Amino acid sequence: MVTAHNVTTKKDIVKPLQYIQETTNILTTPTAYGTTPTSSPTFVAAGLNTEITLNPDVVHQDVDVLGSEDIVDAVKTGELYTFTTRFNPTDSVLLNYGLVSGAGTGTVDASLSFIFSEKLDNTEYFTILKGCLPTSTTLSLERGTWNADMTWICKEITTPATSHGLTSPTFVSIPTASPLTHTDAGSDPFAWNSTATPERRFSTTVTRDMSVLSVNGESTITYAKPTTRRIEFSVDAFVKNTTFLTDFKAKTA
């Protein structure tokens, strides 16, 4: 018979998901990639977080030999880490890491470390996500609050531990700021071809390709940097002229 135990739910999150820059620019300081600042780090809330999904993957190679119909071993050859987060943004700071062009601090040129803690069987455990870079950012709005979904590649997601290993960190508590809504930008927030256009639904996705350095002798990736950015969007707009169709036919950017 299974013994009853304390199941972890959203109420067991103690310190919400929060982050800090590892370096202002991994292009000029690549050795800082994947290194969480340990001396008096000050963390920033990752929006009004509603969901986080960790995706660790152990890469292995099957060992198959003559004389046996079964594999005789499955050898670990590497570790790959990604995670996704869903949140209601209270500002554009975290979003800019995924949306805007690389330009040093506050953009995709700067890798991040995330941390959160949760109660596991009534004991607080910390998880640190190191060397995080955004590979996909989706921002959507439908006459309510802004919703954001971000996918990140990581160098490492640590095993939950009762000690975070940081010296005098400043953590943020559960955020209480109001999320951004469809009215925060005023009336007619959407413009097409320099013309204000009424719409009721909008979504944009920015996808980034990463160049990843993985070498013999290391189980995790050594370094990663952004290489390509692709932007797409969709909008449910009310048609009041022929501009959309004309621009579509002319392939006008």
Model-derived features: where do they sit?
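Signature of extracytoplasmic/envelope-associated structural regions
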Residues: 2-253
